[in-house]
């Protein structure tokens, strides 16, 4: 909204100048209020999205708790709390600066340590909160891969290092205005004329967390009893499918802040006089997210039925999350029909990675490396195949002839950028987190003792079980709860009566 006192003066006649100045002043005030209101709405939208993403920590905690054995429940839930707490402090001190401290070089940020000089025109407290929620999500992914056998001090060290340095550097590369591969670069020097497209973090979040977990689990080795002497896999099932389902639905809910919230703003008009604005893109992103997850869940359901003969709810939950991890990178730049393809292939990737992990005797209690690493990598490739040019221009700035999806007629440049992203993330996380886990192992700070692992860390490290196996009130013996395990069969095999222990 604009106003010219000179133009108004001609129309108003005598004493026109004062009247024109007054009218323009009032219109200017109204215009400023509109700007302030738009900023407040966008800021509220980002804060609400941050709250949704943070709620995913509860989902991670429940998912992890249900996926491990009961004797390690307190341990895994404590590590999830630790991820958020340690991540909050180290992301405040270092992480946000390394990620978004502009102006900086293409490798790492160098401003805003401890949020110094914030707020600015490009960085605000709400943006820090939102990005912190992403950082601790990456750390939460890693904790699942090394569950049930890792020392508590190792969790503290790796979580702080990941959220304070490793993850922020990757997010700087692909999400900041200075990153060498970022599509947001202000100097126009884009990788393959497009930059690597990873809208909400299939690579930046999921691959980082998954590959870090991969190295942790590889260096630690499998849990005791996971494979027999002949190398055959033995299922060490989690103790609560109910918690797995609860955690999955909480993560699903939080993903609506994870993906649509990554727009950061909602009051952006694309075409004047139409309904086509960022508010519509936000809705489309929520739809693509939903369709990818639902398709992956159903594909996993029937795929596992064919492979194992069972309808397994925990496998379906993992398939659902694999679809979400895959669509995260391209959720805003593809059509809803393409999201169905994304989810279908993500389920196949997850099933294939799980088969490969079993053959290689790789043990990941939550399938985190397969789910987040494998499906995240597929999500980046999927974006290179199906990204729409008009959506890329709306989000990343209008650039005529911008490279887009290969299958959409956009050539292979975007695919090249996405493959480079996969390679550099794999290399960076392997070099940093792999080295860290190796050092921790050499210092005997990584894996717990065999005795602790057999007994369970809840009892040996955390002072007791997460659940009451019996009622401490001796006057109510009749309502004691007991674990029931089968007796070893007699030579004749006749005695199959369960024995309380």
UniProtKB/Swiss-Prot annotation:
One of its GO terms (molecular function) is ammonium channel activity. Disulfide bonds: none annotated. It is found in: Cell membrane. It comes from Arabidopsis thaliana (Mouse-ear cress). The keyword Zinc does not apply. High affinity ammonium transporter probably involved in ammonium uptake from the soil, long-distance transport to the shoots and re-uptake of apoplastic ammonium that derives from photorespiration in shoots. Contributes with AMT1-3 to the overall ammonium uptake capacity in roots under nitrogen-deficiency conditions. This is Ammonium transporter 1 member 1. The modification Phosphoserine is found at residues 475, 488, 490, 492. Keywords: Ammonia transport, Cell membrane, Membrane, Phosphoprotein, Transmembrane, Transmembrane helix, Transport. It is a multi-pass membrane protein. PANTHER family: AMMONIUM TRANSPORTER, AMMONIUM TRANSPORTER 1 MEMBER 1. Self interacts. Interacts with the receptor protein kinases CEPR2, At2g28990 and PAM74. Induction: By nitrogen deprivation in roots and nitrogen supply in leaves. Its main location: membrane. Gene3D superfamilies: Ammonium transporter AmtB like domains. GO terms for cellular component: ammonium transmembrane transporter complex; plasma membrane; plasmodesma. Disruption phenotype: No effect on ammonium uptake. Higher expression of AMT1-2; AMT1-3 and AMT2-1. Highly expressed in roots. Expressed in root tips, root hairs, root epidermis, rhizodermis, cortex and pericycle. Expressed in leaves epidermal and mesophyll cells.
